[in-house]
Swiss-Prot record:
Gene3D superfamilies: Metal-dependent hydrolases, uronate isomerase, domain 2, chain A. It catalyses: D-glucuronate = D-fructuronate; aldehydo-D-galacturonate = keto-D-tagaturonate. This is Uronate isomerase. GO terms for biological process: D-galacturonate catabolic process; D-glucuronate catabolic process. GO terms for molecular function: glucuronate isomerase activity. The keyword Lipid biosynthesis does not apply. Belongs to the metallo-dependent hydrolases superfamily. Uronate isomerase family. The keyword Isomerase applies. Pathway: Carbohydrate metabolism; pentose and glucuronate interconversion. It is an enzyme of class 5 (isomerase). Its EC number is 5.3.1.12. It comes from Salmonella typhimurium (strain LT2 / SGSC1412 / ATCC 700720). Keywords: Isomerase.
Length: 470
């Protein structure tokens, strides 16, 4: 019987073990998409205790706690202490067997805390609390210290177009940090004209760009100024959260002005008008990214804020989102083609939340590849609810069957936690085991030089090349 979480965790044969320990594990981390706070990196935040760093803002864990029947006060309540929340988590973890949280929890205790051979639960919680808190009190366990321990080379944060990016500038000017922290442009509030807060957001954009916005060209000018600001701060990627993928042929500016004018006047837009405006903004932005050498990321298919009562209580991003089931193939094809037809499609990474769409994306990317850029259009790593063993395997296998796995830019944390870098380790173990199994079964050559190069490329090299502006 196998022992739980040894050094060879998830590695089922000698080929897999060699690929992981010799080639994957030593590679740096290029975490091109995350939700870390740039202020916490700039300030080199020190965490008071394990409960704070482990549970603060982690809606994956919050969902598990709620599923276990834990009172909300012990999840997000301001009236309860970090220790009380931590003990609620300790009592919940043994109930998460089969959920990736059980693996992640123990991987996070191994690295960076060095706790091995101990199962986390109510019986061990006090000892682990003491051991981890002692380490968190040292400089090596500050925000930057943890990133350095985990061999992080680059992180891409997620930032609104109106953000000042002051903390990114502060980090760039700080010679004491050798990790690149680049902003990523996230313009969701610009193209989602149907949202209640759209008009209020446009006023904030006006102030940030110093441009009055009454016509569509005014919006272009405001966005251009903010794009320039992001570029000056080292941005080279954008990200878009798309719940419903809409497409309509882009109308002329007179029609776009009329649509924007109606919205500013508080009038209700038709579904066609929403699609026309959304498409116009996304296509224009995509062309701007192409001109700047940026990567465009599309995260497609979440259904957000399902629980109205809890949304009113806690706001967004608190663990009440799930997988949507809208059809995406036609609209995605037309959206990408609208940029490609003028040879202005940027490097693009497509992510789907619904795994039924894996093959849609795996085949879609082959329609829009381009010369001189290996893997110009990518099928991104298993996202969110697919960020687990089966989800990662499905994505890797379907990409390999319908595209080129060797050109894949690999894993990202998509996380708000400084302890989530072990997700790269999790991914690397799964990748190496998959290749090792194929080689053992005679499906691919047992050629260490060939396989090791592929592993190192997927773990780091491909992403580093892909996100470099030439």
């Amino acid at each position: 019987m196998a022992t739980f979480m040894t050094e060879d965790f998830l590695l089922k044969n000698d080929i897999a073990r060699t690929l992981y320990h010799k080639y994957a594990a030593p590679m740096p981390i290029y975490d091109f998409h995350c939700h870390l706070s740039p202020q916490e990196i700039a300030d080199d935040r020190r965490f008071d205790n394990l409960g704070q760093i482990w549970l603060e803002g982690d809606h994956y864990k919050w969902r598990a706690l709620r599923s276990a029947g834990v009172d909300e006060s012990l999840i997000t309540g301001k009236e309860t202490s970090d220790y009380e929340k931590y003990m609620a988590w300790a009592n919940t973890v043994p109930k998460t067997l089969g959920n990736p949280l059980y693996h992640w929890t123990h991987l996070e205790l191994r690295r960076p805390f060095g706790i091995t051979g101990t199962l986390f639960g109510p019986d061990t919680a006090e000892s682990i609390w003491t051991q981890c808190n002692e380490k968190l009190a040292t400089p090596a366990f500050s925000a930057r210290g943890i990133m350095q321990q985990m061999n992080v080379r680059m992180v891409g944060t997620t930032d609104d177009p109106i953000d000042s990016l002051e903390y990114h500038r502060q980090i760039a000017a700080d010679d004491s940090i050798d990790i690149e922290v680049a902003p990523s442009w996230r313009p969701d509030k610009v193209f989602k004209i149907e949202l209640d807060g759209f008009v209020d957001y446009l006023r904030k954009l006006e102030a940030a760009a110093d441009v009055s916005i009454t016509r569509f060209d005014d919006l272009r000018q405001a966005l251009t100024r903010r794009l320039d600001h992001f570029a000056a701060c080292g941005c080279r990627a954008s990200d878009h959260g798309i719940e419903t993928l809409r497409f309509a042929p882009v109308p002329d500016d007179a029609q776009l002005d009329a649509i924007l004018g109606k919205r500013l006047a508080g009038e209700t837009l038709s579904e066609l008008e929403i699609a026309q405006f959304t498409t116009a903004v996304l296509v224009w932005l995509g062309r701007q990214y192409a001109a700047r050498g940026w990567v465009m990321q599309l995260h497609i298919g979440a259904i957000r804020n399902n629980n109205t009562r809890m949304f009113r209580l806690l706001g967004p991003d608190t663990g009440f989102d799930s997988i949507g089931d809208n059809n995406i193939s036609w609209a995605l094809s037309r959206l990408l083609d609208s940029m490609d037809v003028t040879n202005e499609l940027p490097k693009t990474i497509l992510y789907c939340l619904n795994p039924r769409d894996n093959e849609v994306l795996a085949t879609m990317i082959g329609n829009f590849q381009g010369p001189g850029i290996a893997g110009k259009v990518q099928f991104g790593s298993g996202w969110w609810f697919n960020d687990q063993k089966d989800g990662m395997l499905r994505q890797l296998e379907q990409l390999s069957q319908m595209g080129l796995l060797s050109q894949f830019v690999g894993m990202l944390t998509d996380s708000r936690s400084f302890l989530s870098y072990t997700r790269h380790e999790y991914f690397r173990r799964i990748l190496c085991n998959l290749l090792g199994q194929w080689a053992q079964d005679g499906e691919i050559p047992d050629d260490e030089a060939m396989l090791s190069r592929m592993v190192q490329d997927i773990c780091f090299n491909n992403a580093q090349r892909y996100f470099t502006i030439k």
